[in-house]
């Protein structure tokens, strides 16, 4: 039984414990965690829903004391078991942070695995674009955790991600695209990534992806999707990878037919959805419809044209004709300017059930909705 709507993480309503079992004292009422941001979600083959988010214990700020919280539901989003899945280093009580999760659920060598990737800092007190002197920045890291027990426990994966960024020589820091990655038809794992380039590179922010066959050894393509940056999602379509990117105003979309060496505009999705001033993260996935694919997308309409990022909505993209349809304004509210508008979609077709879920920011909380009722309309848009 799936609930239509529920609160996953409640602002000033959650208590967590640290690695030693001690209560983490936040600045929220009664010592609770103050604010939650940046939701990511995946649905497993068992129908389990796993949601990740920044647990911003003391303030909504990006530069603050942050852990990665995880919530797990086995009853379709009705109830949630919550904990900290990834702890920061506890080096700086004000600035140590792991943040901006991106997740994948995939079959890796015969075992269903959840991967979640987060950025890590300890001392930087400004936005990451302010640190472009070194490649990579010495305070930055990008870490990966996994679960092989349906989201019950998580452990760190020792990867070469930091090494490939160091070897590149032009990247100061790199983050996941935020939200979800994917497993390609050939089995490769793909995380969308956004990166800050060093000062000698004209464009500060670029996007791309990293890929792996085993979740341990990762590679970075030789090219970049340049000129547009910040949060992005990757989908697979007609032997290409398509990049959907946050932009101030109309969202941008580019495709690569040579696995990340070169990128060209992708007209069916490029400049189709307007997030207005400042832009906002969005979530883009594909849903099968017969022998075709439809892209489902969620992001804020941002009717006030500011950081309140109102009206988080669901869209369907016809990837062949380029038409786009607004399906549902599922959060028709004005957000909190301290942090608002982010969302993540998850589609799953299991033996007995087909689901479409969304999680999103709601005034410092993370909420869940079941959008499966829209699947017939979305699938007709092919």
Curated annotation (Swiss-Prot):
Family matches, as SUPFAM superfamilies: Sialidases (SSF50939)
GO annotations of cellular component type: cytoplasm; intracellular membrane-bounded organelle; membrane
Keywords of the record: Disulfide bond, Glycosidase, Hydrolase, Repeat
Annotated catalysed reactions: Hydrolysis of alpha-(2->3)-, alpha-(2->6)-, alpha-(2->8)- glycosidic linkages of terminal sialic acid residues in oligosaccharides, glycoproteins, glycolipids, colominic acid and synthetic substrates
Disulfide bridges in this chain: 42-103
Coiled-coil regions listed in the entry: none
Residues given in the record as substrate binding sites: 37, 246, 309
MF annotations from Gene Ontology: exo-alpha-sialidase activity
A Pfam family reported for this protein in Swiss-Prot or TrEMBL: BNR_3
EC number: 3.2.1.18
Top-tier EC class: hydrolase
Family statement: Belongs to the glycosyl hydrolase 33 family.
PANTHER family in the record: EXO-ALPHA-SIALIDASE (PTHR10628:SF30), SIALIDASE (PTHR10628)
Quaternary data: Monomer.
Protein name (record): Sialidase
Organism: Salmonella typhimurium (strain LT2 / SGSC1412 / ATCC 700720)
């Amino acid at each position: 039984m799936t609930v239509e709507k529920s609160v996953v993480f409640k602002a000033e309503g959650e208590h967590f414990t640290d690695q030693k079992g001690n209560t983490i004292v936040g600045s929220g009422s009664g010592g609770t965690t103050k604010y939650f941001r940046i939701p990511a979600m995946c649905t497993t083959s068992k129908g389990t829903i796993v949601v990740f988010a920044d647990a911003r214990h003391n303030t909504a700020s990006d530069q603050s004391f942050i852990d990665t919280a995880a919530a797990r539901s086995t009853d379709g989003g009705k109830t949630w078991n919550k904990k900290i899945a990834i702890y920061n280093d506890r080096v700086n009580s004000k600035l140590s942070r792991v943040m901006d999760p991106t997740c994948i659920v995939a079959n890796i060598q015969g075992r269903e695995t959840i991967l979640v990737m987060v950025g890590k800092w300890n001392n930087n007190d400004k936005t990451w674009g302010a640190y472009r002197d070194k490649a990579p920045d010495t305070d930055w890291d990008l870490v990966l955790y996994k679960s092989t027990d349906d989201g019950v426990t998580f452990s760190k994966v020792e990867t070469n991600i930091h090494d490939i960024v160091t070897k590149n020589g032009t990247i100061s820091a790199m983050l996941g695209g935020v939200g979800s990655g994917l497993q390609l038809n050939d089995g490769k794992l793909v995380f969308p990534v956004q990166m800050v380039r060093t000062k000698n590179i004209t464009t500060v922010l670029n996007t791309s992806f990293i890929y792996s066959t085993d979740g341990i050894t990762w590679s970075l393509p030789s090219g970049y999707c340049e000129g547009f940056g910040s949060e992005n999602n990757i989908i697979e379509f007609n032997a290409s990878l398509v990049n959907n990117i946050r932009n101030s105003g109309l969202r941008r979309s580019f495709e690569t037919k040579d696995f990340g060496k070169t990128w060209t505009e992708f007209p069916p999705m490029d400049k189709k959805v307007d997030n207005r001033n400042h832009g906002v993260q969005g979530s883009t996935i594909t849903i099968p419809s017969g022998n075709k694919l439809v892209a489902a997308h969620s992001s804020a309409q941002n009717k006030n044209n500011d950081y309140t990022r109102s009206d988080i909505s669901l869209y369907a993209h016809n990837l062949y004709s380029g038409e786009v349809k607004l399906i549902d304004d599922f959060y028709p509210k004005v957000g909190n300017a301290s942090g608002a508008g982010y969302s993540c979609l998850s589609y799953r077709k299991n033996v007995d059930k087909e689901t479409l879920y969304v999680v999103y920011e709601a005034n410092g909380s993370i909420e869940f909705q079941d959008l499966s009722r829209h699947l017939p309309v979305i699938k007709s848009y092919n």
